[in-house]
Amino acid sequence: MPHVRSAAVNILVPSGYVNDPAGMAGMANVLSEMIQRGAGKLGNKELSLAMDAIGLDRNCSAGTNHLRIWGATLARNLERSLDLFSDIIQKPMLPKDELPAVKQLSAQEILSLEDEPRQKVLIALKQRHFGSPLGNDRRGTLEGIKAITHEGLKKFWKKHFRPNGTIISVAGNIEWKPLVDQVEKYFGKWKQSECAAPKQQKPEGGYLHLAKDTQQLQIGIAYPSVPFGHKDYYSAVGAVNVLSGGMSSRLFTEVREKRGLCYSVWASHQNFKEVAAILCYAGTTTQQAQQTLDVTLSELAKLSKGIKEEEVRRLKVGMKSSMLISEESSSARA
């Protein structure tokens, strides 16, 4: 991308929340914060200052299968960014005295969900549909956070932070050969190790009602779809776009615009390596809940009857536009 002056780095380490130890749900999320609190020869404050000194916009978070470390800066500071990230990944201090504060932050994040009923419903929906560990929430549980120890954290890092399974992507104003040399310089001595994949449990499925005394009501629906790599994957993604691809989509038009049944309604395609699902959400009132559910289910059922040429053209334009716009951003491409 010679037309930009920035560079973005995206590093995925195979240490996602599906690997959280039994009884310690939230371990990966806690670790994503702890590795930023000092690494290599730099303590917590010094590490933050070093990254700020090169204008490194960064983030670290636990995903499903991977822990993601991301950063964007001026292209001339790329090598320094790789240097700092390599220490965060391979030489984190994991200071014991910082763990209580990090655990407290994680617990507060879980407790804050009580004020976000939409999030609570979606978390329960994924757990019910996918089962453990795929359907687990990255935040973990209060019991799991409480059970995390410093020794357990170090063991988790040592076991799951490994080069085999790690993905490093870089985009921006870069030159290939120097980049390869820099990655080799900072990550070349990282030793491989083996780790068994977590065993997926059978999901419960069925219906679940979460009682809460409120005037609002949240509806979540999930049903199986096809994962990336399947011959019908793009057809499934296209179908979701017809349902929920903007203000002209079917759900928005039929549920919200025509009938005024809810303040929010959408559908999305949730994709994992071997399984996938279409998730639907509607936020409405207790008085209009049944009609909202009925109309939403009706629109889902209508998909089997096909879509119009106009809808096909619209979703193609939307998907192409999204891809082209993202190509102009080094962060999005990384």
List each language-model region with its residue ranges.
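His/Glu-based metal-binding/catalytic segments typifying zinc-dependent metallopeptidases
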Residues: 1-17, 25, 194-250
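Short, conserved beta-strand segments within well-ordered enzyme catalytic domains
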Residues: 8-12, 31-34, 59-61, 68-70, ...
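Generic solvent-exposed, charged/amphipathic alpha-helical segments
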Residues: 32, 180, 184, 239-240, ...
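Charge-rich, well-structured scaffold segments of protease-associated domains
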Residues: 46-198, 209, 227, 257-334
